């Protein structure tokens, strides 16, 4: 008996049609939407030998949201060269700030990707660019901020502040101070991959004994070499660190979920608790809390801060904007929302924090910046 394949063929054609329409319509929608004009200056002051730039995720989002420079030029990331290029020599990526920051809506202080102990070597060989923000840079940033330019700073950018004078200039803009400490969840404190040799040496030098820790914990390191370990089951009930938005932060961002965070974060001290939009939740025991007090470490770990006093600024204390692959889907309308929905809230998922935290947070920041009209003389 001859089999009839017509129903199967029709079903396959119907599926292909639905898929094609589902991809083509959002692409046409993206192509037809009017671009958003924003001039964004990305300041990359990391050492030239640092890992790939952390602003790749920002550039993907700018492209996906169809945000372009006011000249009409779009932001383009060249993945092959691992650097950011803009068309026709109109680059807004800079290591040296101009004498006057004009025609700018947003200054973005970028930090480079790092999976190890946060450290930036600010010493350079003769003839090389000086890594780190100088007093000159800080003065120009503060001058621009006083004229209404918003400032966004990423995790680890404070390690690029080369002097106390730089800190003094940027402190009123960001509305926070650095404690000098950084923290990270460690799943195996005996692992030489997760706990570097430098951390072990610093601990042994100060404590006068071999590295004694095992199991899970939270590692805290100071820029001067100090090391504190919060042991899972003793200093913290569980070693997990969860990012949780405050009530103000939930209203601001629309994010209701909590997310387990496993990368490095800055421990900062805000001028006002009202500036905290999200914080890291830890299950500190009384013993762990006392250990932090003895070390002079704040027990509250802010994650995202927004300063809207005399200056408009935002600080992300974690590396949320890291993007592993620069996706083609940036030209699909709504792809950012789809990825936020379909990406599981699991720490093992690559780019989870990018889609579920960084993208919605940066979209809200860009929306606020867009609402502010700058008229330059």
Residue ranges and their predicted role:
Residues 19-50, 54-76, 90-93, 179-240, ...:
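Generic extreme N-terminal start-of-chain segments
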Residues 43-45, 104-121, 154-156, 315-323:
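Short loop/turn segments at strand-loop or loop-helix junctions that form parts
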Residues 3-75, 250-264, 268-377:
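Extracellular ligand-binding/catalytic regions of CAZymes and related secreted enzymes
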Residues 67-142:
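Post-signal peptide N-terminal segment of secreted/secretory-pathway proteins
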Residues 120-128, 132-248, 252-253:
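A glycine-rich, often tryptophan-bearing local segment used as a flexible ligand/cofactor-contacting loop or short
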Residues 82, 86-96, 100, 195-292, ...:
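Signal peptide-directed secreted proteins
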Residues 38-40, 102-106, 146-152, 311:
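Loop/turn elements at helix/coil->beta-strand transitions in domains of secreted/extracellular proteins
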